[in-house]
């Protein structure tokens, strides 16, 4: 009888241990980018570090100390590839759930270690130069992942950037402006992504195809012609721009499909590998896709693209 009770106690203990450890493995780990020394920061009491990811949305008043949420791939699946994810939200907020944590878990299923970037949203009240604030955070994020690659079992030459909507603008900015010195780096680690995944991205700041909310939030109401050109990333593609996988829908009323088309054409001009999937429907902001629409097939197309570039091969 005593042995039976003992076995029951052991079973109960193991059950609770599985719950505790299971939860700990499924949760992400936060990595602060700047350790309290954010470049070009202006203190403002109205901006508090009060991120609530339960709602799936983060507003611009909630991020003053940007960070990465790390989602390591399991040892059984890990292939050494990593992706830094930039959620969208018109540079006014961030859809951190369906363009962040849900995407990270999908990447984990592919054996990819994912990092959701909670970047600062541009605002003159907390930044000396709001146009480069998100880029500072993005460059820093890639350098951190590359510097700590061994710790996470990552190949430092297999680190990609991924962005949705305005997060796609940040991702394409990091793909074209990675050599731009927007802060004083601690070392010579490259901030260049090895590949990019751009989903219904804002690419251009040009009047005829930009998303006006994203442009105004990043550059203000009256940007100069030089600023518009500088942050129109289809104009900044060069021979060092990393390969890209892109997705857009023809009926996107928020961000015109021409954003992706122009970027893909610029990539083609420089003979850089680029795959663009244009769907007849889907609109905007669908994350991994809506089950009834054809755009829901993009994750599988992306998987095949990653596979074709040997980014899913276990070593």
Stretch-by-stretch model annotation:
Residues 140-210, 228:
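Primarily recognizes the serine-hydrolase "nucleophile elbow" in alpha/beta-hydrolase
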Residues 94-96, 101-103, 119-156, 292-295:
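Catalytic nucleophile-loop/oxyanion-hole region of alpha/beta-hydrolase
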């Amino acid at each position: 009888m005593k042995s039976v009770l003992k076995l029951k106690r052991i079973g109960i203990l193991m059950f609770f241990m599985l719950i505790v450890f299971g939860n700990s493995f499924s949760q992400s780990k936060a990595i602060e980018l700047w350790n309290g020394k954010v470049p070009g920061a202006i203190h403002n009491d109205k901006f508090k570090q009060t991120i609530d990811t339960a709602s799936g949305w983060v507003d611009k008043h909630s991020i003053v100390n940007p960070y990465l949420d790390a989602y390591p791939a399991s040892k059984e699946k890990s292939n050494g590839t990593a992706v830094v994810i930039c959620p969208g939200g018109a540079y006014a907020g961030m859809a951190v759930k369906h363009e962040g944590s849900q995407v990270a878990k999908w990447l984990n299923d592919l054996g990819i270690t994912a990092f959701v970037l909670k970047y600062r949203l541009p605002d003159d009240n907390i930044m000396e130069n709001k146009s480069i604030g998100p880029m500072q955070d993005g460059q820093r994020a890639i350098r951190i992942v590359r510097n700590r690659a061994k710790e996470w079992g990552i190949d430092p030459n297999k680190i990609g950037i991924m962005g949705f909507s305005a997060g796609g603008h940040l991702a394409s900015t990091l793909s074209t402006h990675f050599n731009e010195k927007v802060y004083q780096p601690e070392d010579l680690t490259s901030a260049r992504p090895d590949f990019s995944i751009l989903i219904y991205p804002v690419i251009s700041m040009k009047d005829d195809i930009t998303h006006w909310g994203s442009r105004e939030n990043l550059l203000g109401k009256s940007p100069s012609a030089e600023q518009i050109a500088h942050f129109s990333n289809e104009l900044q593609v060069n021979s060092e721009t990393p390969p890209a996988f892109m997705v857009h829908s023809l009926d996107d009323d928020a961000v015109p499909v021409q954003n992706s088309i122009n970027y893909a054409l610029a990539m083609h001009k420089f003979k850089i590998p680029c795959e663009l999937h244009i769907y007849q429907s889907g609109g905007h902001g669908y994350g991994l896709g809506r089950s009834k629409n054809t755009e829901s097939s993009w994750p599988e197309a992306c998987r095949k693209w990653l596979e074709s570039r040997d980014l899913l091969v276990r070593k």
